[in-house]
Amino acid sequence: MRGNIAQLMQQAQKMQENLQRAQEELAKLEVTGSAGGGMVSVTLTGAKECRKVRIDPSILSDQEMAEDLIAAAFNDASNKIDAESKERMGSATAGMQLPPGMKLPF
């Protein structure tokens, strides 16, 4: 019985180390989302901080369209980060599922 507990503790510690490493890698990650066939692009970090916005000058005359495309590009980048985070955290937890509603990184 004690051997099982010790083994579980070792596995938990290794998983924690893997999670921390994955979080550090995600923080360095930069992802670009785009919209309007590339007329707008938004680059976010893994922490979802905006690093760059590129807007094709041809859409600036239509404010509503520009706003919609910026939002769509941001959402595209955000979704890519979520997918990458899920993949990396899944690898770090060895596929162990988290309870519903719990997201990583915490």
UniProtKB/Swiss-Prot annotation:
Spans traversing the lipid bilayer: none
Alphabetic keyword roster: Cytoplasm, DNA-binding
Subcellular location: Cytoplasm, Nucleoid
Region spans: Disordered: 82-106
A Pfam short name: YbaB_DNA_bd
Signal sequence segment: none
InterPro entries, per database record: YbaB-like_sf, YbaB/EbfC
GO cellular component: bacterial nucleoid; cytosol
Recorded superkingdom: Bacteria
SUPFAM superfamilies documented for this protein: YbaB-like
Alphabetized GO MF terms: DNA binding
HAMAP family named in the record: DNA_YbaB_EbfC (MF_00274)
Alphabetized PANTHER family for the sequence: NUCLEOID-ASSOCIATED PROTEIN YBAB
Self-association state and partner proteins as the record states: Homodimer.
Assigned protein family: Belongs to the YbaB/EbfC family.
Function: Binds to DNA and alters its conformation. May be involved in regulation of gene expression, nucleoid organization and DNA protection.
Protein name: Nucleoid-associated protein XCC1002
Organism of this sequence: Xanthomonas campestris pv. campestris (strain ATCC 33913 / DSM 3586 / NCPPB 528 / LMG 568 / P 25)
